[in-house]
UniProtKB/Swiss-Prot annotation:
Pathway the protein acts in: Lipid metabolism; fatty acid biosynthesis
Protein name: 3-hydroxydecanoyl-[acyl-carrier-protein] dehydratase
Native organism: Glaesserella parasuis serovar 5 (strain SH0165) (Haemophilus parasuis)
Any single Gene Ontology cellular-component annotation: cytoplasm
Subcellular localization, as worded in the UniProt entry: Cytoplasm
Role: Necessary for the introduction of cis unsaturation into fatty acids. Catalyzes the dehydration of (3R)-3-hydroxydecanoyl-ACP to E-(2)-decenoyl-ACP and then its isomerization to Z-(3)-decenoyl-ACP. Can catalyze the dehydratase reaction for beta-hydroxyacyl-ACPs with saturated chain lengths up to 16:0, being most active on intermediate chain length.
Active site, UniProt feature: 75
Tree of life domain: Bacteria
Subunit and partners: Homodimer.
Catalytic activity: a (3R)-hydroxyacyl-[ACP] = a (2E)-enoyl-[ACP] + H2O; (3R)-hydroxydecanoyl-[ACP] = (2E)-decenoyl-[ACP] + H2O; (2E)-decenoyl-[ACP] = (3Z)-decenoyl-[ACP]
Length: 176
């Protein structure tokens, strides 16, 4: 674990995630999470640099589901479902958070994904979404980049999987 990075903990509550969105968690040069309503998690329940399927790091987060979440009112009227792209974005958000947690500096940007599979949906009647990210590699050169596999579970059932999630940290995003 990088002990030089401020606010390193094994878990984070909602207020911590909001602080990340304001640029307060990992310092002024560290990556930020988005603010609500694009923040796709309520808490990070576990983060470690040693565990996971590849023993390169693991992060787990949760989102409490309720019918008042903003996307249910418009996606779709009469047939509310959480957009699958928001679950994918949540996984990218967590890879970026991990890069800040291990000391990476820069502005986070999603760079791609190898493969995504959707085998279920998140409805307003669901209770809880769990995101799991297994880090495969962190490249720490001129560009800091994380590579990970992830999954999204709703109420005990895995409904999305993603391989080779890529997030980079950029010092300058003007030419990105």
């Amino acid at each position: 674990m990088n002990t030089c990075t401020p606010n390193i903990k094994p878990s984070y509550d909602y207020n911590d995630l909001l602080a990340s969105g304001r640029g307060e968690l990992f310092g002024s040069e560290g990556p930020q999470l988005p603010a609500p309503s694009m923040l796709m998690m309520d808490r990070i329940t576990k983060i470690t640099d040693k565990e996971g399927l590849f023993e390169k790091g693991y992060i787990e987060a949760e989102l409490d589901i309720n019918q008042d979440l903003p996307f249910f009112g418009c996606h779709f009227i009469g047939d509310p479902v959480m957009p699958g792209c928001l679950g994918l974005d949540a996984m990218w958000q967590l890879v970026g958070f991990y890069l800040g947690w291990v000391g990476g500096k820069g502005k986070g940007r999603a760079l791609g994904v190898g493969e995504v599979k959707f085998t279920g949906q998140i409805l307003p009647t669901a209770k809880k979404v769990i995101y799991r990210i297994n880090m495969k590699r962190v490249i720490n050169r001129k560009l800091v980049m994380g590579l990970a596999d992830g999954e999204v579970e709703v109420d005990g059932r895995i409904i999305y999987t993603a391989t080779d999630l890529k997030v980079g940290l950029f010092q300058d995003t003007t030419s990105f």
